[in-house]
Design a protein with these regions (language model features):
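Terminal low-complexity tails and localization/encapsulation signals of metabolic enzymes
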Residues: 1-35, 68, 72, 122-147
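Short glycine- and Lys/Arg-enriched binding-loop motifs that mark or flank ligand-binding interfaces
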Residues: 6, 14, 89, 111, ...
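Histidine- and aromatic-rich ligand-binding microenvironments
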Residues: 7, 22-25, 34-45, 194-201
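Alpha-helix N-cap/helix-start motif
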Residues: 16-17, 43, 81, 99, ...
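Glycine-rich loop-to-alpha-helix module at the N-terminal edge of alpha/beta enzyme cores
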Residues: 30-120
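Rossmann-like NAD(P) dinucleotide-binding subdomain of oxidoreductase/dehydrogenase enzymes
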Residues: 122-201
């Protein structure tokens, strides 16, 4: 039986509580995996790792670097789309035909924001006041929390994670306890793409 630990600071870890919960295949009702049950202590570790990664260089990293990592992740998603689609079917009961198309689209979302990362810019705001200069400058927020529902885990992670990373934020993802497996499996792709430890937890 598959067992999914938590992904915190670039490493797979057991939950602080030592507790696990079952995930069932909605088609058969059979338990097919055990998922780590996170608690406040685990969340604190994840947020601390994300904060350290943000302050340790990710927040000031070159946008072109962030864009390259996002595009690399998109390529990996394209390669793994069929497997991810089947995993989502097993985890949440969606139709394979729907998931086949949806997982192929997910890579495009990361590719789009990868291309946008080095195009985030401020603007100069005209003023009629002498000796005054108005402008906007966009900066990353820092650590962001991404809570995702059960119905389309990977797609909804993409909607939130891709723009957050492109802008220079770090993230802590809290997937639905009903469909956690695909999000946890996705962390393998994050690691393969080369994101620094703690950027995504």
């Amino acid at each position: 039986m598959k067992q999914y630990q938590q992904y915190i600071n670039g490493a797979w870890t057991d939950p602080e509580s030592g507790e696990w919960f079952d995930t069932e295949n909605p088609y058969t009702g059979e338990v097919w995996a055990k998922i780590a049950r996170g608690n406040a202590a685990d969340m604190d570790r994840a947020v601390a790792a994300a904060k350290q990664a943000f302050e340790g260089g990710w927040g000031t990293s070159l946008p072109s670097y962030r864009g390259k990592l996002l595009c690399r992740l998109a390529d990996i998603i394209d390669r793994e789309a069929d497997r991810l689609g089947r995993l989502e079917v097993q985890d949440n009961g969606k139709l394979l035909a729907e998931m086949g198309g949806q997982t192929k689209y997910i890579g495009e979302w990361y590719r789009y924001f990868g291309g946008l990362a080095d195009k985030i810019e401020g603007t100069v705001i005209p003023t009629d006041k002498p000796n005054m200069f108005n402008f906007t400058r966009y900066e990353p927020f820092g650590v962001v929390g991404l809570i995702t529902p059960w119905n389309s885990p990977l797609l909804l992670v993409a909607y939130k994670l891709a723009p957050a990373l492109a802008a220079g934020n770090t993230a802590v993802i809290k997937p639905s306890e009903f469909t956690s497996a695909s999000t946890l499996e996705f962390m393998e792709l994050i690691a393969e793409a080369g994101f620094p430890d703690g950027v995504v937890n």
